[in-house]
Amino acid sequence: MALSTKVPHLMTLADLTPGQIQRIITHSYHLKRTAQPWLAPQGRAGSGGKYSNAPHKLRMPSQSLFSKSIALLFSKRSTRTRLSAETAALLLGGQALFLGREDIQLGVNETVPDSARVIGGMCQGIFARVGDHSEIEELARYSPVPVLNALSSLWHPTQVLADILTLHEHAALFDPASASPTPSAADAFSQKYTKLGEVRPLTVAYVGDSANVLHDMLVTYPRLGHQLRVASPENDKYRAPKAVWDRVVELGCDKNIFWTADPRAAVKGADLVVTDTWISMGQEAEKAQRLKDFAGYQVTEALCREGGANPDWKFMHCLPRKQDEVDDEVFYGPRSLVFQESDNRKWTIMALFDLLFGKWSLLARNGEGADAGSE
């Protein structure tokens, strides 16, 4: 297909329509189903547990990154994002090149515009995990190839996409009639798209700091029909900054957001309870004050019971987790979707790599009603 003359970048889910977001989720699920059999030992399924040397008879997932290189430009430490990106690029036939803080320092040894042009001249996509959001905006401004936000001070789009995929896969937990259909053995290994379970409108409670994950939730969940109830201390540094709130209002999401300083009020009627780290990278010097400010915000069974959460409420955390944020009973208990959510980071990043870096099709046309299977 002919490439767009305008380079597509993705900084936040606020840049996408609900249809485009759903397209990514559907494509993520499709890639997950078609790629997973390739990751299992050959002959394991249906062979009585015995291994086989027979070649795979399954079709490979999309190879849109064949012979292409993706630069992972990470100025912050990473476990899940880096692993997801490197394995996703490999499954798409490409190569991920990791450039850490010690390898390249944006704006220190070389200006950001120069770095963007150099990296973009050698790679076909840039996946950047930066500090201040202005860094990735400048990178995108001068890059000749697509730039995808792996994390910045303001936004974390790939995390929220993984959360949404997890909700769709577990839709039956919220409404038994919404279960995703189980594909047959033949369909599971085909290139045929399987419809995901529809997630009914949920009440989502977020308890904790207003950071990048919450910011992308604020501009996404209300547009997908969910109510968002947020609890954070009454201090401006724990509330959404103006740049984020302006996007919230612009998209009309503020009408479905309730903000309070009382975590019990936030979890009232909650189907899903979400929290995040209270102390992000670079905030270590504030640890003592932050622990004091967030006293009483730990997600526990007692807090959710006293606040009146839905009896079947579920829990998510983007990781890494500290026990101050959520106790072991919830984190490791049957309510937790944490590790399913973590696993889905790989598949949503793989979908973004395929659509944004491989095909330049994510933003080249409106995702409303687009058939992802036609790619």
Swiss-Prot record:
Annotated residues for binding of carbamoyl phosphate: S78, T79, R80, T81, R129, H156, Q159, C318, L319, R345
Catalytic activity: carbamoyl phosphate + L-ornithine = L-citrulline + phosphate + H(+)
Active site: C318 (proton acceptor)
Entries under SUPFAM superfamilies matching the protein: Aspartate/ornithine carbamoyltransferase
Enzyme class, first EC level, given as a word: transferase
Domain of life: Eukaryota
Residues at which L-ornithine binds: N212, D276, S280, M281
UniProt KW Phosphoprotein keyword: no
GO biological process: arginine biosynthetic process via ornithine; citrulline biosynthetic process; L-arginine biosynthetic process
Pathway in which this enzyme or protein is active: Amino-acid biosynthesis; L-arginine biosynthesis; L-arginine from L-ornithine and carbamoyl phosphate: step 1/3
One function term, GO molecular function aspect: amino acid binding
Localization of this protein: Mitochondrion matrix
Keywords: Amino-acid biosynthesis, Arginine biosynthesis, Mitochondrion, Transferase, Transit peptide
Pfam families: OTCace, OTCace_N
PROSITE patterns: CARBAMOYLTRANSFERASE
Subunit structure: Homotrimer.
NCBIfam families: orni_carb_tr
Record family assignment: Belongs to the aspartate/ornithine carbamoyltransferase superfamily. OTCase family.
Protein name: Ornithine carbamoyltransferase, mitochondrial
